[in-house]
Amino acid sequence: MIYTSSKSLQYLAVPIYTIFKNLTIILIAYGEVLFFGGKVTSMELTSFIMMVLSSVVATWGDQQAIAIKASSLEDLDQELVESTIFVLNPGYLWMFTNCISSALFVLIMRKRIRLTNFKDYDTMFYNNVLALPLLLVFSFIMEDWSTKNLSVNLSADSLAAMVISGLMSVGISYCSGWCVRVTSSTTYSMVGALNKLPIALAGLVFFDAPKNFLSFFSIFLGFLSGLLYAVAKQKKIQQQKVLAATLEK
């Protein structure tokens, strides 16, 4: 999950990456039905469809920006155009793999917390310890470990950023385990999706990400779907309370 996330960011623009992460919510929602029972309400399903639509709109905006950029270059041959557009293709493949692995990770984590009665610290510890060997293996096999590359990527600024990122990751891991334990996998993923939308907007403002109507509209749809899910969740909780009160009578 962590490795495919990094590879996705290597090829995809920040807004596209963050919007596509929302596709995982649908997999998790129906995965919870299979793992834990229950159902997905029509309003929840509508919010998921809107999230998918936001991802599709984001893709259109990304492709549109690439086409405009390619057509504006002078003396551009066909090979350069194909190489420019191809940069997106492996990114989408990595993103699809990341969606599947992320959904399985959250569902299995909640299942394991229930079975073993893990505390939040235990969840954080085992998540990171089990992931470390796989990350090391893939890093040695797939990445460039030449002296030149190490000198560029292991500068003082890069090391400081890695340390800060690592410390923040510890906090994220702990809070993730806590959120999954006290709420649900779907709610955890939806909150995470809403957290990423401001980052997607920041990518449009501060980074060299494609800026067009479709990019901004996709972010708007993402926010709207998150609000709709929150309303759907509140209604679902109220219905469960009414049903429980009826059964008690």
UniProtKB/Swiss-Prot annotation:
Signal peptide: none annotated. Residues 37-47, 106-122, 181-186, 233-249 are cytoplasmic. It is found in: Golgi apparatus membrane; Cytoplasmic vesicle membrane; Endoplasmic reticulum membrane. Glycans are attached at residues 149, 153. It comes from Saccharomyces cerevisiae (strain ATCC 204508 / S288c) (Baker's yeast). Belongs to the TPT transporter family. SLC35D subfamily. This is Probable GDP-mannose transporter 2. One of its GO terms (biological process) is GDP-mannose transmembrane transport. It comes from the Eukaryota. InterPro entries: SCL35B1-4/HUT1, TPT_transporter. One of its GO terms (molecular function) is GDP-mannose transmembrane transporter activity.
